[in-house]
């Protein structure tokens, strides 16, 4: 009602719960219909079973992506997903297979690097050692225009694990960038047809 009357809010971005339920789809649909939400993001992280177990997301509802995409299609709600590159347990082959599985279903997919958050189990000394995790501090990407937010924020980004070394991880970022570029701009879709 306020958007119709005042023109605001223009839109906003929502981080949805990781264990989606039908109510989230309905809530997102209401926001979409009110013209304040462009789409819902279904956050997968990975399609690799071993990685899901290591990061303790194996039992999360969101891993049944087709249930949620089917529901979004039924109600006319645009959707996308996110995958995280750098999870322990993820290999070059499992990353490629998982990414291709997601985009082959016609799902637009954003890619992010795994960050070690303070207090998270993955950032513990035991996890770092067990999974051979190496990380580097990097400036937090996309936090807003530095002109308006001069304070730089940093995160510890995973750059290597015992499952995917530094060179392989760099190669997977490059491979994913090229593959995503081709997919999102329909180059590879046209070739596949």
Where are these regions (language model features)?
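Short, electropositive alpha-helical surface patch
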Residues: 1-2, 29-31, 93-106, 170-177
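Conserved SAM/AdoMet-binding glycine-rich loop
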Residues: 1-80, 85-87
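Generic structural hydrophobic/aromatic packing signal, biased to beta-strands
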Residues: 12-14, 109-111, 172
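Short alpha-helical segments and helix-capping/turn motifs at coil-helix boundaries
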Residues: 25-26, 96-97, 159
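Flexible glycine/acidic-rich beta-alpha junction loops that bind and position SAM and/or redox cofactors
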Residues: 44-45, 49-56, 85-93, 105-169, ...
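Residue-level signature of transmembrane alpha-helix interfaces in integral membrane proteins
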Residues: 59-61, 98, 184
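A generic secondary-structure signal for well-formed alpha-helical elements
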Residues: 76, 106-109, 113, 179-183
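Feature captures the RNA virus RNA-dependent RNA polymerase
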Residues: 173-193
């Amino acid at each position: 009602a306020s958007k119709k009357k005042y023109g605001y809010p223009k839109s906003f971005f929502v981080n949805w719960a990781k264990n989606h339920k039908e109510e989230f789809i309905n809530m997102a649909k209401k926001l979409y219909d009110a013209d304040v939400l462009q789409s819902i993001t279904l956050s997968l992280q990975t399609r690799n079973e071993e990685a899901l177990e290591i990061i303790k997301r194996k039992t999360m509802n969101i891993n049944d992506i087709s249930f949620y995409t089917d529901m979004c299609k039924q109600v006319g709600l645009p959707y996308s997903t996110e995958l995280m590159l750098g999870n322990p347990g993820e290999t070059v082959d499992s990353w490629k297979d998982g990414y291709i599985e997601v985009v082959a279903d016609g799902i637009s997919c954003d890619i992010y690097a795994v960050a070690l958050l303070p207090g998270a189990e993955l950032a513990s000394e035991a996890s770092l050692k067990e999974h051979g995790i190496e990380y580097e501090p990097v400036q937090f990407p996309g936090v807003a225009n530095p002109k308006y937010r001069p304070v730089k924020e940093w995160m510890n980004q995973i750059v290597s694990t015992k499952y995917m070394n530094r060179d392989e991880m760099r190669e997977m970022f490059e491979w994913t960038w090229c593959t995503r570029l081709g997919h999102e701009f329909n180059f590879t879709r046209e070739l596949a047809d």
